[in-house]
Amino acid sequence: MTWNTRSVEERRKHIGSFVAVTPTMKRATDVFRRCYREYHEGQQASCSFVVGETGVGKTTAANDFMEEIREEYRGTLKDGIDVHTIDPKTYPTNMSVTFQQPGRGLVRPILKIMVSKKTTYKQLFGETLAALGMPTKRATLAEMKSIVRHQIEGQGVRMIIFDECQHIVDSSQIRDPYEAADFLKELMKETRVQICCVGLHYATDFLLENGQLETMKSEEHHMRPFPLDFNESAELCMFLRSLSDDLPFDRKPQLFTPALALRLHLASDGYVGYITKYVSMAAKDAIDQNLDTVTMDLIGDAYARKHNVPDKENPFRVKGEIDEDGFQKIKAARRKMLEEEACKSRATRRRKDREKSLRKAAAAA
C-alpha cells in the first residue's frame, strides 16, 4: 500500500512515531541497557547518568530503551505464569514498563519518574511512591521509605529512571542541595534497585559533595548535538537520510542534500529535537495541502511560524549560498534582544507587584 492511499490521520500519526538509531542515540541506549543488566549482579546497586542540553534526544533514548524491555517481557513467563500487557491509558508506556501477572498483581521492571521543580527530599520519596501506584500524602518519611522498599520488591522493579534531574540541583526547597544524593544512595542501598539519572549537564553536580554516591556511579554519558558534517557517514546526514526515508510520502524528501542539511543545522544548532520539530510541522502541512513531499519552502513556513521572524532571519528563505557565520550572528542578536525584552518585562511586573503591595499596606494602615 502506498502512502497516498492512506488516510490523513494515519499519515499524521506516523510522523510522531519516528526514532532514528544514530550512533549518539545508540550510545545513550547502551548506557540504559548496561545499567539495567547490572541489576543484582553485585552486592550493591549502581547508578548511571545520561545528560545533555534540551533537544539532544535523552528522553527519546530512555523511551526507546523502555520499549525494548517491554518487548522482552511480552509473552514471557514469570514464575510459570504468563504476564499480560496493561492498557497504556492506565499506565502510560513512556512512564513505566508495566505488566499484569494473573493472581500476583503488577510487574514493573522499569519506572520513569519526572522530577518536579522545587522538589524536596521527602517529595522525592513521594514521587517514587506515586510512580509505584501508591500515592500518599499523610505518611511520615519513615513510613514512605518502608512502603517504597516493600513495593519495589513486590512489583519486581529492577531500574528507576529519574528524568529532569537538574531540578534536584536547582531546588531551593532542599536545605542542602546535595541532600538528593542521599536519597538516591538510600534507594540503591536499601532496595538494590538500579538508578539512571537523566537531565541537563549540571545534573551531576550533586555528586560533588557525596563521595559514596560517586563510588556507586558506573557511567556518566554526555549527549551532544550533531556537528556540521556533510559526509554520508556523518551522524547528521545519517539522521537526515533516515528521517527522509521514514516520512509518509511516496516521493521522499532529500533532507540530506548539502543545501538543506546546512539550513537545518543552522536552524537547529544540530539539536535533533529541533530538526524533527521543523520537519514534522512541514510534513503535516504537506499532507494537509495534498502535496507529494516536503519542500524547503514548507520547512521555511514552519520555521517562521515557530520563531516569528522575518525572511532575512529565516535560513530556509535565503536564496543561493548562505553565510554561516553571518546567520549565527543574526540568531545571537535576536536571542539577545528577546532576553533583554524579557528582563525588562519581568522588572516591570515586579515593580507593579511592589506598588500594589504598598497600596494595600497603606490602605490597611
Descriptions of predicted regions:
Residues 1-5, 13, 21, 55, ...:
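C-terminal alpha-helical "lid" subdomain
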Residues 80-86, 110-119:
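A short hydrophobic beta-strand->loop->alpha-helix junction that borders the nucleotide-binding pocket
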Residues 10-29:
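Dynamic helix-loop-helix/coil hinge segments at AAA+ ATPase domain boundaries and subdomain interfaces
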Residues 68-98, 134-136:
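Post-Walker A helix-loop "phosphate-sensing" segment adjacent to the P-loop in P-loop NTPases
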Residues 29-41:
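Pre-Walker A adenine-sensing motif
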Residues 44-64:
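Walker A/P-loop nucleotide-binding motif
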Residues 159, 167-173, 178-259:
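The catalytic "switch" region of P-loop NTPases
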